[in-house]
Curated annotation (Swiss-Prot):
It catalyses: tRNA(Tyr) + L-tyrosine + ATP = L-tyrosyl-tRNA(Tyr) + AMP + diphosphate + H(+). Homodimer. It is an enzyme of class 6 (ligase). It is found in: Cytoplasm. This is Tyrosine--tRNA ligase. L-tyrosine binds at Y37, Y168, Q172, D175, Q190. It comes from Pyrococcus furiosus (strain ATCC 43587 / DSM 3638 / JCM 8422 / Vc1). Disulfide bonds: none annotated.
Length: 375
């Protein structure tokens, strides 16, 4: 596989942004060690925005010949008050539920979970020189920049926070350099931390990424954040600027079960959630169901996606590209309920291996029922 084919895999949907493609090409050309990582807070049940979006991208990285790593951010979850702020509970959930759920998610999206390295943050944070890296990075970042970066924790700028949360962004940047990561991967909401990593890369004294004497800047790959199924906090949305302002409130949330489908939901739960989903007729710009169709169903194109309808409503229709489906929906030729039903059945089939695994091994879900899921 040549360099351009590997770059195409990195750019493939659900990727929304690569910082930068030029640097990615440079890393390929000089033969630098390609180490990917994506970090997750341990905060509750895995929904499709976490499991399938990240799983799909991990599969792409593997096909491009890049080593993949999932970072189970237990300390970060503790700092951010997840699972009641209990570190031992967070660690137990990370290893007994989250790791297994991500392995299964990667598998259904075409990846090889056995080739993914899972690392618990504690394993590296307890080494003394990790904190040298945190301080080294911190000395190159202003306090105002850190305050602007707390949005990576799902916090709002100006929100009252404890001091530990100001350390979090610098830890996230340190995770990249301490692990020798050349490709930092996350959802678009983690962009601020990755931009800091790129900017400080050549200034670091402790754990810079060096290849043949050159200090390397990491590449940041940001995937699309699936919209939650709930109605937006404001409707109609009048402009792209307005959409950007409320987009964080429109993503899937573990604390709002009807905004998300979880990887182990039953067929009945999936159908009910899609039935209740916000999907206004002819609306193609701010429509969560269409968003899911674009990034889950039509990740690969062409793909055959059949929508079953009674003959009196036009009969079955098959689409091979998202643009075809989007056009029919915009013109009112495709009814929202028919689309919702088809997406529900698609997800039921896609998630069947995960569902069956947890039916055979119920212990992880039993553990989750016993813990306090916060935020």
């Amino acid at each position: 596989m040549d360099i351009e084919e590997r770059i195409k895999l990195v750019l493939k949907k659900p990727t929304e942004e690569v910082l930068t493609v030029e640097n990615l090409r440079h890393l390929f050309e000089i033969g630098a060690p390609l180490q990917h990582y994506i970090g997750f807070e341990i905060s509750g049940y895995i929904h499709l925005g976490t499991g399938l979006m990240a799983g799909a991208k991990i599969a792409d990285f593997q096909k491009a010949g890049i080593k993949t790593r999932v970072f189970l951010a237990d300390w970060h979850s503790w700092i951010n008050d997840k699972l009641g702020g209990d570190l031992e509970t967070i660690q137990e959930v990370a290893l007994k539920y989250f790791k297994v759920g991500m392995e299964k998610s990667i598998e259904v999206m075409g990846g090889k979970p056995e080739k993914v390295e899972f690392v618990l943050a504690s394993e590296i944070l307890e080494k003394g020189d990790y904190w040298q890296t945190v301080i080294d990075i911190s000395k190159n970042v202003t306090l105002s920049r850190v305050l602007r970066s707390i949005t990576i924790m799902g916090r709002k700028m100006g929100e009252a926070i404890d001091f530990a949360k100001l350390i979090y962004p610098m830890m996230q940047v340190a995770d990249i350099f301490y692990q020798g990561v050349t490709i930092a991967h996350a959802g678009m909401d983690q962009r601020k931390a990755h931009v800091i990593a790129i900017e400080v890369a050549e200034k670091l004294r402790y754990h810079p990424i060096i290849h043949n004497g050159e200090k390397l800047k990491p590449v940041a790959v940001h995937h699309h954040l699936l919209l939650g199924l709930q109605e937006p906090p404001k409707w109609p949305i009048e402009s792209e600027e307005e959409f950007k302002e409320i987009k964080a409130e429109m993503k899937m949330s573990k604390s709002k079960p009807y905004s998300a489908v979880f990887i182990h939901d039953s067929p009945e739960e999936i159908r009910e959630k899609l039935r209740k989903a916000f999907c206004p007729a002819r609306e193609v710009k701010y429509n969560p169901v269409l968003d899911w169709v674009e990034y889950l169903v039509f990740r690969e194109e062409p793909t055959e996606f059949t929508i079953h309808r009674p003959a009196k409503y036009g009969g079955d229709v098959t689409y091979t590209t998202f643009e075809e489906l989007k056009r029919d929906f915009a013109e009112g030729k495709l009814h929202p309920l028919d689309l919702k039903n088809a997406v529900a059945e698609y997800l039921i089939d896609l998630l069947e291996p995960i569902r069956k695994y947890f039916e055979r091994h119920p212990e992880p879900l039993e553990l989750m029922k016993s813990v306090q899921i916060t935020r």
